[in-house]
């Protein structure tokens, strides 16, 4: 036990020395600069990512004019159409399902990408790459701002903050109204249950309850619905 504790202390001192040598001993505000790993080991304050619950409510007008905004983070959503897009646009899939939001909410671009990834992975394992068509209908136009502050032990000594601060750009979000479709999925009748499960998993990534609605194909699903 003593040997492990001595090794831990030695590693902590080594990392702290390395950070000091790389970034200098003091920062612009006079506080000591420490890397995130050293800060975690020594229990110091670090800049934490705020939870999505802080951004899910619709407040004020949308902040979207990117030509006047500098430094907007890149969008995490890589694809809005996945699967057999040609068959979907020509109407070859007899069953169409939609995932709709139950509340007015803001959905961050990271949540939209996570929902797309999990739903696409679920349906592709069963239907194959050409047996479905998935589409994300919402685009994260709204730019999120955050007043950066240090959090953790001793943070109140160095970061008092300012009331009603404008903040810096930290991400983007889509403003979704109640009943608005977020994701749609087109499949063949034999993959209906898997498609519902894929949209259910996608809804778990959003900060609001969602409803899966069958838009087309009731006549092909006798005994399943």
Describe the residue ranges of each PLM region.
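Intrinsically disordered, glycine-rich low-complexity segments
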Residues: 28-30
